């Protein structure tokens, strides 16, 4: 489960009439009796069509952490007006992450998500996970390449987030599976004190030259033979959980899609609930962005 960093982003992560309590140490939704927390949102739902088409995942396990008591529902939204409740039960907990007694077959195109309704006051909804016990996994190691030119604050923001949420987080699956290579075209960044992050001073050869340098540094690193390289803009706000989901998705890919490339969507930095693009078309020098100006707060 992922959490908003500010109130403006709440509807990208959850819909609730409770109170969102967010901190670095722990987060939860504080609920009174009858309050709800609904996760049919951009960041906390699962796009079943993509996972079913491209990965070997067929069934899902669901783990939930609550403190208190309430009703949990596993729901599937085929379209805005077509909703199915796949599993429902009264559930209580002491805050520990516990597996629900259900096994969900991944439906076709649509959105899989959880709903929770508190049955008593002072109930906390803390966390949930979708997982699979599939044995066939690909061994994936990611190199993230960032090209930058005199954007010290932007690059430091990204590196700090990765350090805190991945490298210093024992629970992160990427902790030993990610290396970062920064092409410093402005030659203004100090060397990294974190061994997993490599800063390379580079001639100002633009984005193409900077990304190429980062790719070259990754390929010649024999101590960390990366299977995939992720190209990241220096001024983009990167949420580390996106890198974790990318790693998970790649590790479960079907063999026939093993050479495919993943393209990420881009949100508006000033208005983070507006999608700037999700893919683009190139035609003789003209670029047409796709799925522009979508309000991602809507269901």
Model-derived segments and spans:
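A recurrent flexible, glycine/aromatic-enriched loop bordering the glycosyltransferase active site
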Residues: 292-299
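Phosphate/oxyanion-binding active-site loops and adjacent basic polyanion-contact surfaces
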Residues: 151-158, 203-211, 238-242
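Glycan-recognition and processing domains
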Residues: 1-49
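Short beta-strand-to-loop acidic/aromatic patch adjacent to the donor-nucleotide binding site
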Residues: 223-237
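Acidic donor-binding segment of Leloir-type glycosyltransferases
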Residues: 162-200
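Conserved donor nucleotide-binding strand/loop of the catalytic core
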Residues: 192-209, 217
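N-proximal low-complexity "stem/linker" segments adjacent to membrane-targeting elements
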Residues: 18-21, 36-160, 173
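Conserved donor NDP-sugar-binding/catalytic core segment of glycosyltransferases
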Residues: 220, 237-288
